[in-house]
Amino acid sequence: MGKSTLFNCLSNAKAQAANFPFCTIEPNVGVITVPDERLTKLAEIVHPGRIVPATCEIVDIAGLVKGASKGEGLGNKFLGNIRETDAIIHVLRCFDDDNIVREGGAVVNPVEDKEVIDTELQLKDLETVESQLQKQSKIAAIGNNKDAKVAVSVLEAYKEVLEKGQNARCVEFESKEEQHYAHDLFLLTAKPVLYVCNVDEASAKSGNKYSEQIAEIAKSEGAEMLVIAAKTEEDIASLETYEDKQMFLEELGLEEGGVNRLIKKAYNLLNLQTFITAGEMEVKAWTYYKGWKAPQCAGVIHTDFEKGFIRAEVIKYDDYMQYGSEAAVREAGKLSIEGKEYVVQDGDIMHFRFNV
C-alpha cells in the first residue's frame, strides 16, 4: 500500500494511486535521477553548460495477491513484469487507517503481507527450477555433459531452499560456471530486495511497531530496509520551492526526504557507483558496477574508449574541492595516472586517454 504514491514522487509521473489491489494493471515506467550533491558543488567551480545526474529506471508493478503464482489476479502477467527487473522494492503498509482496504483482512499485518508475496515468488521460482531440473537431468544422464552437470548442481541447491520456503538469494555459488548459470535463470527471489515500510507522518522519523517487525526480518535476511511516509512525501513533492521543502522536513525532524533516501538505497542495492567527468560543456555522473576497472568504466562513455584504452587521469573528489581547480590539483601532484588494472572508486573524477 503506497507504492504508486511513492512511484509518483520518485519519477514525477502520475500513476493512478488507490487502495485496491489492481489499481495498477499495466506497469508504469519512470526514469529517476540519483541525488548527488557532488555534481552541484563541482558545477560551482567548473561552471559547465549543464549538469547531468545519474539515472535509474523504476517500474510500478501491480500488487500481487495470494494465488498469483497460479495466475490468479492477473498473477502471471505481474510476475513476468517482476522478472524483467534487476531488484525489487517491496512497499509494505505499516500504518493504521480504517478507510483503507487490506487484502485478506482488516488488521494491519506487514509480516503476513510480506510472506504472501514471498510465497508467490518462491512458488513461481520452484516451478521454473523443477522444469529446468527435469530437462538438465536428462541431458546430464546421456553423456559427460559438464554444462548440464553444473546446471543440475545449481538447480538442486535452489530446489532445496525453495521447498523450505526460503528465497533463492540465500544460496551462494563458488564457481564462475555455477554463478553464470544461476544468473541466467532470472529467478524472482534471487533478486536483491529493499523493504520500504510505509508509515504515517508521526512515525516518519523513528518508525513504529510495524516497521520494527520488518526491521527484524530484514536483518535476519541480510536485506535492506527503509522507513518512509509516502503520503508525506507526496505533500513535500507538491511544494514549489527547495526552501519550503527543507522547512517541511525540519518540522518533521528529518535531515533528508524519504524519496532521496530511497533512491540512494536502491542505487546501492544494485551495487552501483558513480564516476564523474567535469568540463566546460557538462558535469556528468556515469553509472558503473562496484569493482569495475578503468577500461570498463571508459566503455560506459563509449565502446571505443574501452577498446583503445591507454590510461586514465584520476582526481579524487575531495582533492578537487580542496584545491579548487584541475590546474591546482595537477600542481599539487594530486592527479594520478592509472592503468588497466585500476579499480575505479565512487566519486572519482576521470579523464580517459584512448587510441583507436
What spans do the regions from the language model cover?
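Short, flexible surface segments
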Residues: E84, Q345-D346
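Hydrophobic faces of stable alpha-helices that mediate helix-helix packing
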Residues: I82, L126, E130-L133, V152, ...
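C-terminal-of-GTPase-core extension/linker across diverse P-loop GTPases
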Residues: M1, F7, K135-V343, M350-V356
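Short amphipathic alpha-helical segments
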Residues: A18-N19, I100-G105, G207-K209, L239
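Flexible beta-alpha connector loops of hexameric P-loop NTPases
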Residues: L64-K70, A106-V108, E115-L121, A140-K146, ...
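Alpha-helical initiation/capping and key positions within long helical/coiled-coil segments
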Residues: T24, K77, L121, T128, ...
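Short, exposed interaction patches on small structured surface elements
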Residues: I25, L92-T128, K219-A237
